[in-house]
Amino acid sequence: MLHVTFLAHSGFLVEDGKRCYVFDYYKDPNNIVWQLAKRGRELWFFVSHTHGDHFNPSITEFDGPQTRYICHQDVPLESKVKKCITMRPGQDALLDDVGIHMYGSTDEGGSFYVKTNTANIDSDSIFHAGDLNWWHWLGDTPENNADAKRMAWREFKELDGLAVDVAMFPVDNRLEDAMEWGSIEFLRRVQVNKAFIPMHLNGPLWTPSVYFKALFGEVPIWEPQKDGDEATF
């Protein structure tokens, strides 16, 4: 069972009953993570890349015996906290009984797949995309958008056959008519069992298009309505 709390933008807290996994902490208007830290909960911070809307250097303030940091290799944290590992796309890590694989990105950094207990085949799994998306900008040049498509196809191909329980993926309003393209290609390749969660909206809440619903009407979707919303899967 996973309890998911939307912090803001692309930031999420995922609790599995033992640990608190914090993905791309940018801001936490409701001080949810601080409350957990004060209660001595085990906090694992995942940082996909250094963009200011995915990485807040203040996460070093949570450092302590119950805190770990798992970061893309470009994130400058390793010398500033006690327990930090850095990863690059294609790399695996095993920390305690938690399995982590870093997939690629179509922008900076990488994306995370987390298996909460590698000793139990039925344990929960989490995918956080970071800035992995099909970044097709309607006002951009045909050449740039062709490059964006090639990059997206290259990274999505690595995900073929993956199954996850909860997946957090960008559905960015700034892409206008192309805002769902990345999520469509992602879901064509990845089986999401419990919740597909849109993030990185940069605008109003997402209403899935008729086309999206026709393709993925059976995919469970949870869309947070505001910072601090939570659900259990």
Name the predicted role of every residue range.
Residues 4-10, 81-95, 158, 179-233:
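Binuclear metal-ion centers of metallo-dependent hydrolases, dominated by the metallo-beta-lactamase
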